[in-house]
């Protein structure tokens, strides 16, 4: 799984703020079941990968998983015990900015009980409250 963009226009970004709710990526598009965020947060590439692995491991064979978020924001950190000044720190890891309503993972090709269990395991690895939703036909 990709954990960061191949290339970006700029190495460092402002932190920004997470106002409002997500209007993009808030509907199920690919699978039948999904994990939806209920709180705003930065989700790191490692957390995304841990959730993906948990779902894959639980679902075993059968079923398909779609990861609907991508870590495209670099987070900079200063070295420890460094004095203030002398510019911004270097990029250390990547995060996905997630607002309430955003779909994190989607799943299809499995029964609802399997999907619910797999997604609940992935939800426990996320730093935010989230809910299981299913496609209403």
UniProtKB/Swiss-Prot annotation:
Keywords on record: Chloroplast, Plastid, Ribonucleoprotein, Ribosomal protein
PROSITE patterns for the chain: RIBOSOMAL_L16_1 (PS00586), RIBOSOMAL_L16_2 (PS00701)
Gene Ontology BP annotations: mitochondrial translation
GO CC terms: chloroplast; mitochondrial large ribosomal subunit
Subcellular location: Plastid, Chloroplast
Main location: plastid
Membrane-traversing stretches: none
MF terms (GO), sorted A to Z: rRNA binding; structural constituent of ribosome
Gene3D superfamilies: Ribosomal protein L10e/L16
Signal peptide: none
SUPFAM superfamilies for this protein: Ribosomal protein L16p/L10e
NCBIfam families: rplP_bact (TIGR01164)
UniProt cross-references to PANTHER family, sorted A to Z: 50S/60S RIBOSOMAL PROTEIN L16 (PTHR12220), LARGE RIBOSOMAL SUBUNIT PROTEIN UL16M (PTHR12220:SF13)
Family statement drawn from the similarity comment of this UniProt entry: Belongs to the universal ribosomal protein uL16 family.
HAMAP family: Ribosomal_uL16
Subunit-level organization: Part of the 50S ribosomal subunit.
Protein name: Large ribosomal subunit protein uL16c
Organism: Hordeum vulgare
Gene behind this protein: rpl16
């Amino acid at each position: 799984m990709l954990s960061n963009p191949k290339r970006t226009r700029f190495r460092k970004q402002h932190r920004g703020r997470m106002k409002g709710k997500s209007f993009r990526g808030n509907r199920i598009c690919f699978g039948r079941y999904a994990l939806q965020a209920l709180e705003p947060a930065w989700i790191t590439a490692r957390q995304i990968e841990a959730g993906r692995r948990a779902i894959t491991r639980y679902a075993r064979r059968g079923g398909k998983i779609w990861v609907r978020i991508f870590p495209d924001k670099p987070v900079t950190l200063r070295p420890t015990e460094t004095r203030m000044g002398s510019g911004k720190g270097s990029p250390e890891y990547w995060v996905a900015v997630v607002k309430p309503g955003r779909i994190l993972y989607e799943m299809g090709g499995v029964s609802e009980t399997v999907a619910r269990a797999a997604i609940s395991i992935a939800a426990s690895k996320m730093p935010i409250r989230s809910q299981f939703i299913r496609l209403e036909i």
